[in-house]
């Protein structure tokens, strides 16, 4: 009879070997001097700076919507609640390229054209990078934050209300502090997802060097010119930034459960 524990551990090992093997294969083409040259190049510094700035702005904007929306979905019953809750999964079931195409099509209609002409230029512009990232992460951010609020018992808010707190007062003084670590972890994960966003960004903002060239787009452009060593350097940089964000999220989640 197959040992169940060994079977499950074998599955864990298989997953580790898949991703670990992919990461290890990068070092076949790794060159230290080329890696350093890639890191300090003007285009790399620009793409890293743009990626981090855009991801930060997109994450902050997403959280401004996600936190109140997630709280409403976690606490209230209202018409269309299940529909909205389902739509949060849209970025997970629709490819980023499709989301980017939706945005591009929107800006070709009269309303979108008016926004482009009188408000802000998004198509093939830096603002389009932020918008593309925002659209791909806001639903995911709301899902993560809702999970944090779901773990906070409504009884704490009820107790605060009986002591005279208003609904908003109970939210800011009780629910938000108790969900803080979960929200911070959600922020880190959302930021990491924004950093790695490619499909929607390239569809809406294009691949203009030193203008809309985020780190994932820089990887694509290096690979398209058969610059394998440069591609490896940028991939390792993106992986390092992403793993750093994931480590922060994991640490915050652990603190959340350990009190």
Where are these regions (language model features)?
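Short coil/turn motifs that cap or connect alpha-helices
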Residues: 79, 165-167
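Membrane-water interface segments at the C-terminal ends of transmembrane alpha-helices
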Residues: 1-31, 42-150, 174, 178-199, ...
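Core catalytic ATP-binding domain of two-component histidine kinases
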Residues: 169-171
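The alpha-helix within a helix-turn-helix
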Residues: 160
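Short glycine/proline-centered loop/turn elements that form peptide/ligand docking sites
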Residues: 152-156
